[in-house]
Amino acid sequence: FALKWPNDVLLDGKKVCGILTELSAEIEKINYVIVGIGLNVHQKPGDFPPELRERALSLKMATGRFFRRAELLRKILAHYEELYFAYLEQGFPMVLQVWRELNCTLGKEVSVTTTEGSFRGTALELSEGGCLLVRKASGEIVKIMAGDVTLCCDYFDN
């Protein structure tokens, strides 16, 4: 699997999972983070709207297997807890390293939509804070903190 910045999990180049977060913070303190995970488990191709069928996938479609949702949840939460404790010990650089290793956005042509508009460019790197750095055709490098980023081609292509 691979991660598409900032919050999509891809399997075989198709979205199988999305992760959303809500954060309450002050300048030097995070009050709380709420994490929502949407995972396509048993959908069949016909369960997706026609416009998503080429871009979406379920675990069952990818593997042909049936998954017990409670067991999936247990494994996800155990892995989440493992990463959380590693973060507490090692800090955000550890998270950033894992994110970079699994990322399929970097080096790819992307279409970016933010509250300030839309543009195309090349995804260069994740900043130390986790922002996506994108080079526009003009050469300007833009730091994306939030927005919709779409890969312009299949991420398996070179």
Predicted features, each with a name:
Residues 11-158:
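Long, positively charged amphipathic alpha-helical accessory segments at protein N-termini or as interdomain linkers
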Residues 8:
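Conserved active-site carboxylates
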Residues 1-5:
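General beta-strand structural signal in soluble alpha/beta enzymes
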